[in-house]
């Protein structure tokens, strides 16, 4: 309220000391909202306000620095109780006021400048405190995020190591039936390249399939040999050798049969 009163007075009457104040000399004529100037701390205005004396010294820049404000605060605080309340006696307060100047022609008073400066400083201080609070909160959040990242780092590293380690996949083995297994393991390199080759033992299923094929055809083509080798899980060489041995056996059986038949026919000849 006090700052509003001073600023409005300075805007209407720029020449404060030259104008005789009216209706302010008698304490009874003052309303309740204007308190005693002696009870108000003059240092709060920051520019040497003493009572109602509005004679102030303008600085070159129009604003007051922190050093001038501090000095004026000390001077105002020491001189406030010693000086009288008003510079003019109460008998001269009824003189007619001069014509007010337009507000556009009035230069900004240092009181208003200091008042706005105080508002700006308060706004800046509140903004700085808000920025500091947000910075503190963001820093705490950053610390929390960093700690969370540090906690997640071991878990992620463990997952990465678990993923990087190849899981032991079972080796893909072909399905082997009992008739596909060999009864005797052949050792080709035991006796060297010129050593005796181990005999191959065929299963019943393999022997049966080979006998059926030999019954239909005693000689195999290359294509049919490959098909039988894949079907019986044997090599082409094994199929070829088996068919050779089977033909030799067949010839021997036929020769013995023909010889027996010839011998039997000669015996029954009359």
UniProtKB/Swiss-Prot annotation:
Q: Which InterPro entries match?
A: Antp_homeobox, HD, HD_metazoa, Homeobox_antennapedia, Homeobox_Antennapedia_CS, Homeobox_CS, Homeodomain-like_sf
In which residue ranges is the amino acid composition biased (Low complexity)?
75-86, 119-134, 154-166
Q: Which SUPFAM superfamilies match?
A: Homeodomain-like
Motif residue range(s): Antp-type hexapeptide = 176-181
Q: Does the keyword DNA-binding apply?
A: yes
- MF terms (GO), sorted A to Z: DNA-binding transcription factor activity, RNA polymerase II-specific; RNA polymerase II cis-regulatory region sequence-specific DNA binding
One family from Pfam that matches here is Homeodomain
Family the entry assigns: Belongs to the Antp homeobox family.
Subunit-level organization:
Forms a DNA-binding heterodimer with transcription factor PBX1.
Q: What is this protein called?
A: Homeobox protein Hox-A5
Name of the gene:
HOXA5
